[in-house]
Amino acid sequence: MATINQLVRQPRKRIVEKSDVPALQNCPQRRGVCTRVYTTTPKKPNSALRKVCRVRLTNGYEVSSYIGGEGHNLQEHSVVLIRGGRVKDLPGVRYHTVRGSLDTSGVKDRKQGRSKYGTKRPK
């Protein structure tokens, strides 16, 4: 326990909270341009080809972003919106692309959980 004199000389340090999504700079989403669209394999117990794109954001950052849902229409130079949210089994992927906004189409034939995949209500 510190004495009062010690605390007067050097107050207690506040714990600084570090952001999980620094590239967003406290914004809910950011716009960017795809520089590369590719697939990658997940970490050890899992096996798949995960769809990922490299995005150059409007603030100059370049980040990897996961493309959720079945099938996508993204290619190089597509303009996308990204949000925070990491993919646990892909190291270095800390962002998600928002489906159904800008150049990213919604997931086709999606019936449930549509709002997360930018799909309109079926007639």
Curated annotation (Swiss-Prot):
Composition bias (Basic residues) maps to: 113-123
Q: Does the keyword tRNA-binding apply?
A: yes
Matching HAMAP family, A to Z? Ribosomal_uS12_B
Biological role: With S4 and S5 plays an important role in translational accuracy. Interacts with and stabilizes bases of the 16S rRNA that are involved in tRNA selection in the A site and with the mRNA backbone. Located at the interface of the 30S and 50S subunits, it traverses the body of the 30S subunit contacting proteins on the other side and probably holding the rRNA structure together. The combined cluster of proteins S8, S12 and S17 appears to hold together the shoulder and platform of the 30S subunit.
Tell me a GO cellular component.
small ribosomal subunit
Give GO terms for biological process: translation
Residues annotated as region Disordered? 100-123
Please state the span of the N-terminal signal peptide per the UniProt entry. Answer: none
At the highest ranks, the source species' classification is: Bacteria, Pseudomonadati, Pseudomonadota, Gammaproteobacteria, Pseudomonadales
Highest taxon of source:
Bacteria
Q: Which residues carry this modification: 3-methylthioaspartic acid?
A: D89
Q: Which Pfam families match?
A: Ribosom_S12_S23
Q: How does it assemble?
A: Part of the 30S ribosomal subunit. Contacts proteins S8 and S17. May interact with IF1 in the 30S initiation complex.
Mind telling me which PANTHER family this protein's record contains? 30S RIBOSOMAL PROTEIN S12 FAMILY MEMBER
Which family is this sequence assigned to?
A: Belongs to the universal ribosomal protein uS12 family.
What are the entry keywords? Methylation, Ribonucleoprotein, Ribosomal protein, RNA-binding, rRNA-binding, tRNA-binding
An example Gene Ontology molecular-function term: rRNA binding
Q: Which InterPro entries match?
A: NA-bd_OB-fold, Ribosomal_uS12, Ribosomal_uS12_bac
Protein name as annotated: Small ribosomal subunit protein uS12
Designated gene of the protein: rpsL
